[in-house]
UniProtKB/Swiss-Prot annotation:
This is 13S globulin seed storage protein 2. Seed storage protein. It comes from Fagopyrum esculentum (Common buckwheat). It comes from the Eukaryota. The sequence of the probable beta chain is highly homologous to the N-terminal sequence of BW24KD, a major buckwheat allergen.
Length: 504
């Protein structure tokens, strides 16, 4: 009897242990651990009296591109835990494989290229330098190869690669290796937001990058200040270094026994002055189309189902097959559209499930000439607004009821808006476009005006007593705008008549 109890108890412990290890890969991250994010977030009180719209404060050049870093020691960056980086890859350039100790989300602002993702424990289901193996239904006249012939024709096998283009959102978990190649004719420009307050980051408040090749190039900041010397260590950790350069030659040679000493030296990045973005003009990659990627996922499932008991571990079936890309211009991503004012496109955990695990999301907002959005605030996230086109005016009001930002913004600037701070944006004569990167898998905004606003949900009598106005004025206040979040500019009666006449 006692033996059965001991066995049962041991089995329960084993099941609980396995469940604890696998829980991060499962869906439903609403109940996040408290010790991670809060530990870093509340080490100091944040008293934000002023926000700034800023451009990168440091540029590091490589052979085939530039890495630009925003000053993350300002109050708004430090308190929200955001770290922002912009990478410019020249045509033919290759951003070397690397990983970070913090999850991040990347927006492709310009260009096209190829992205690679390497997930530990997942199979190599992609092939290069060989004829692609299509499903039986698509082979047509192709004869069936024997197993040995198929093995010999596979060529190089690797994990998933996919094409990226302007408007794509690309997330990455902490510790997952990614690389990027620009095979287009224009510069490939991307902006990345790293979440330093994520519970995935275990060590301290610093974001660290780790490269698997190359050697960094150090350059001084474009703007000199006393504070820059104190920031040097943080920036160097963010820029990263080749982790193989720290291992001895003997260890690497023992590990990679089929390579010579010269290759070992190149693995360590010795005498490599190219930086972390290198020229790879001759690099040719066979990138699967969307239907081929779907087939590879199915093919990987079949492979894992063969042999042994025919079972797979569940983690491979879920995490290995997750998508790592979503384009803002996909019709299903349209959240709000106003033909006279603009539109809002959203990529969150509903459209890209991996964002539920990372607790990150993004919005793309397009405002037409003189159109307005807001005032509105984020219920459950901070946001970093990166302007991609045009210019406009932004006002942000904090918890003391005072303006903490009232200025114009333009292309290339980032404005960090903390959770709960109300923001309104008005486009200029050329319109205004921006991307909002947020630290929540399903960020929720609450508008003050419009058909879905908080004022619309409050009874007229409550509004009248709250603002000490008549019920008639309260009704007009509540129902004056029928649009949703994005508002067309105000027009006088004469302007409306001219518009009606021009349409006729």
């Amino acid at each position: 009897m006692s033996t059965k109890l001991i066995l049962s108890f041991s089995l329960c412990l084993m099941v609980l242990s396995c469940s604890a290890q696998l829980w991060p890969w499962q869906k439903g991250q609403g109940s996040r651990p408290h010790h991670g994010r809060q530990q870093h977030q509340f080490q100091h009180q944040c008293d934000i009296q002023r926000l700034t719209a800023s451009e990168p404060s440091r540029r590091v050049r490589s052979e085939a591109g530039v890495t630009e870093i925003w000053d993350h020691d300002t109050p708004e960056f430090r308190c929200t835990g955001f770290v922002a980086v912009r990478v410019v890859i020249q045509p033919g350039g290759l951003l070397l494989p690397s990983y970070s100790n913090a999850p991040y989300i990347t927006f492709v602002e310009q260009g096209r290229g190829v992205q690679g993702v390497v997930i530990p424990g997942c199979p190599e289901t992609f092939q290069s330098d060989s004829e692609f193996e299509y499903p039986q239904s698509q082979r047509g006249r192709h004869s069936r190869q024997s197993e040995s012939e198929e093995e010999s024709s596979r060529g190089d096998q690797h994990q998933k690669i996919f094409r990226i283009r302007e408007g794509d959102v690309i997330p990455s978990p902490a510790g997952v290796v990614q690389w990027t190649h620009n095979d287009g004719n224009d510069d490939l420009i991307s902006v990345t937001l790293l979440d330093a307050n994520s519970y995935h980051k275990q060590l301290d408040e610093n974001v660290r990058s780790f490269f698997l090749a190359g050697q960094s190039q150090r350059e001084t900041r474009e703007e000199g200040s006393d504070r820059q010397s104190r920031e040097s260590d943080d920036d160097e950790a963010l820029l990263g270094a080749n982790i193989l350069s720290g291992f001895q030659d003997e260890i690497l040679h023992e590990l990679f026994r089929d390579v010579d000493r010269e290759t070992i030296s190149k693995l360590r990045g010795e005498n490599d002055q190219r930086g972390f973005i290198v020229q790879a003009q001759d690099l040719k990659l066979r990138v699967p189309q969307d239907f081929e990627e779907e087939y590879e996922r199915e093919r990987g499932d079949r492979r894992r189902g063969q042999g042994g008991s025919g079972r797979s571990n569940g983690v491979e079936q879920g995490f290995c097959n997750l998508k790592f890309r979503r384009n803002f211009n996909t019709p299903t991503n349209t959240y709000v559209f106003n033909p006279r004012a603009g539109r809002i496109n959203t990529v969150n955990s509903n459209s890209l499930p991996i964002l539920e695990f990372l607790q990150l999301s993004a919005q793309h907002v397009v405002l037409y000439k003189n159109a307005i959005i807001g005032p509105r605030w984020n219920l459950n996230a901070h946001s970093a607004l990166y302007v991609t086109r045009g210019e406009g005016r932004v006002q942000v009001v904090g918890d003391e009821g005072k303006s903490v930002f009232d200025d114009k913004v333009q292309r290339g600037q980032i404005l960090v808006v903390p959770q709960g701070f109300a923001v309104v944006l008005k486009a200029g004569r050329e319109g205004l476009e921006w991307v909002e990167l947020k630290n929540s898998g399903n960020a929720i905004t609450s508008p003050i005006g419009g058909r879905t606003s908080v004022l619309r949900a409050i009874p007229v009598e409550v509004l009248a007593n709250s603002y000490d106005i008549s019920t008639k004025e309260a009704y007009k206040l509540k129902n004056g705008r029928q649009e949703v979040e994005v508002f067309r500019p105000f027009q006088s009666r004469d302007e409306k008549e001219r518009e009606r006449f021009s349409i006729v």
